[in-house]
From Swiss-Prot:
An annotated GO BP: L-histidine catabolic process to glutamate and formate
Keyword NAD recorded: yes
Name of this chain's protein: Urocanate hydratase
Broad class of the protein's primary localization: cytoplasm
Phylogenetic classification of the source organism: Bacteria, Bacillati, Bacillota, Bacilli, Bacillales
Length: 553
């Protein structure tokens, strides 16, 4: 085992900045400030890994250092399997993680292959090397809670209490996103180290293991109308039950535990983290049974809060499906966050555009933020987000920024970043990527594509087409994964990263990739019949051959 740190500075050890960018983002994924369990190559989300094992990690490193600027490395589930000569505008790396033939696309078969060292769970940005810590999800979480506030609480979360669980790499964004919307958050996690990490990075305000103290603090902050986040150490099922018994009013209920993975992501009721680890290794079958039974109880408690007046939504971890499979027939009585709050943004090709400064210099991100303000002065949501981010976001690993931008905006920003690198206003190349959770890059019937207007929730073609078009357009590294977010059998999704190194070649590639990528989001929603997407496509001149047949489904 090695201790990995994000590499910074202007000297490179690869044969070009593009290969160097891949290496630095791989290191960044495993930086101790960023990854959840770097010693096990686990970045976030249960067992979402950056490489299959340490031997494969070192082979990836070596290959990247030797890779020519007209070659492409192929990575199969975290292991480098081939290098081929391609051309300078082709991707330097193509990645496929955790992809199983549908009949075998389940956790049991995955775990068998994993034990044999034949596969790796890449989550979304873990195995595609573009994870930037909790900031990567915090704006999406902020926008979700902002829209919830607009729909249910007169535009703001002041005077409300949200109860949730899970403070890992994804769930860790919740406390900050809620307080950014002036709400009070009680965030439960059985693993105290996770609470400590969110306190250390200033995503969470206070830690306690005492429920009465947590409720008192929450009530006082609610009465003052102030934002406050409380990391409450304990088991979610136990604590949710106790809160119901005390009759404490919860206004919003959700969950972001790693429920997508019953074996590695969720701790059953009645077990400490240490006890769970022992049982997981000793009797994995029993562990999964207990874990799923706890999830069923967890969802029943969420439904009870909902019945008592709380706004309830699923935050994309597939916990409703597990509960439904274990006898909770009304598990889907509350919606997922995408159909409830996010889909209109997807129809415009908006999604989690992100970039990282390979120099390691925060001033490069400051200059990029300044440029973003100049380019989009009319985008009030974006400007408000940048104000909050500059005030409240602590960088983890390489300095980075997340900013939800739409079709046209992403290409405009990418070209501007390339120009700033070329002119020396930004000191080193910038890596531009996104989460796989995006407008046109994922098929996930219990999350991103839940309740599609035309019933096409489970159609996986769009994620495949996204990876193909971004490869054709010349992304720097392109990935295709299975099972991210919601677990084996429930999702297919693609990722892209493109490097702005200041060159004319980068300019061509940026313009293509940052147009095709969000364009796929618009196309996907046009095809499903969404009027906002149809209007966007017509206004932006996106060529959709059968657009006049859309919108009548």
């Amino acid at each position: 085992m090695r201790k990995i740190q994000a590499k910074k500075g202007l000297s490179i050890e690869c044969k070009g900045w593009e290969q160097e960018a891949v290496l630095r983002m791989l290191y960044n994924n495993l930086d101790t400030e960023v990854a959840e369990r770097p010693e096990d190559l686990v970045v976030y989300g249960g067992i979402g890994k950056a490489a299959r094992n340490w031997e494969a990690f070192e082979a990836i490193e070596k290959t990247l250092r030797e890779l020519e600027s007209d070659e492409t490395m192929l990575v199969q589930s975290g292991k480098p399997v081939a290098v081929f000569k391609t051309h300078e505008e082709a991707p330097r790396v193509l990645i496929s993680n955790s992809v199983l033939v549908p009949e075998w696309a389940n956790w049991d078969h995955f775990n068998e292959l994993d034990k044999k060292g034949l596969i790796m769970y890449g989550q979304m940005t873990a195995g595609s090397w573009i994870y930037i810590g909790s900031q990567g999800i915090v704006q999406g979480t902020y926008e979700t809670f902002a829209e919830l506030g607009n729909q249910h609480f007169n535009g703001d979360l002041a005077g409300t209490v949200t109860l949730t669980a899970g403070l890992g790499g994804m769930g860790g964004a919740q406390p900050l996103a809620i307080t950014m919307n002036h709400g009070v958050a009680i965030c439960v996690d059985v693993d105290e180290t996770r609470v400590d990490k969110r306190i250390a990075t200033k995503y969470c305000d206070i830690k306690t293991a005492n429920l009465d103290e947590a409720l008192k603090l929450a009530e006082e902050a609610k009465e003052r109308g102030e934002g406050l986040s409380i990391g409450l150490v304990g088991n979610a099922v136990d604590l949710h039950q106790a809160i119901l018994e005390k009759g404490f009013k919860i206004d919003i209920i959700t969950d972001q535990t790693s429920a997508h993975d019953p074996l590695n992501g969720y701790v059953p009721q009645g077990y400490s983290v240490e006890e769970a680890k022992v049982l997981r290794e000793k009797d994995p079958k029993k562990y999964v049974e207990l874990s799923q039974a706890s999830m069923a109880k967890h969802v029943e408690l969420m439904l009870e809060f909902h019945k008592r007046g709380a706004v309830a939504f699923d935050y994309g971890n597939n916990i409703r499906q597990v509960a439904f499979n274990n006898g909770v027939r009304n598990a889907f009585d509350f919606p997922g966050f995408v159909p409830a709050y996010i889909r209109p943004l997807f129809c415009e090709g908006k999604g989690p555009f992100r970039f990282a400064a390979l120099s390691g210099d925060p001033k490069d991100i400051e200059r990029a933020d300044e440029e973003m303000r100049k380019l989009f002065p009319e985008n009030e949501k974006l400007l408000r987000w940048l104000d909050l981010a500059e005030e409240k976001i602590s960088y983890q690993g390489l300095p980075s920024r997340i900013a939800w931008l739409g079709y046209g905006e992403r290409a405009k920003m990418g070209l501007a970043l390339n120009r700033l690198v070329r002119d020396g206003e930004i000191s080193a190349p910038i890596v531009i990527g996104r989460d796989h959770l995006d407008a046109g890059s994922v098929a996930s019937p219990n999350r991103e594509t839940e309740s599609m207007k035309d019933g096409s929730d489970a159609v996986g073609d769009w994620a495949v087409l996204n990876a193909l078009i971004n490869t054709a357009a010349g992304g720097s590294w392109i990935s295709f994964h299975h099972g991210g977010g919601v677990g084996m059998g429930y999702s297919l999704h693609a990722g892209m990263v493109v490097v702005a190194d200041g060159s004319e070649r980068a300019e061509r590639r940026l313009e293509r990739v940052l147009t095709t990528d969000p364009g796929m989001g618009v196309a996907r929603h046009v095809d499903a019949g969404y009027d906002i997407a149809i209007q966007t496509a017509k206004e932006k001149g996106i060529h959709i051959p059968m657009i006049d047949k859309a919108g009548d489904k």
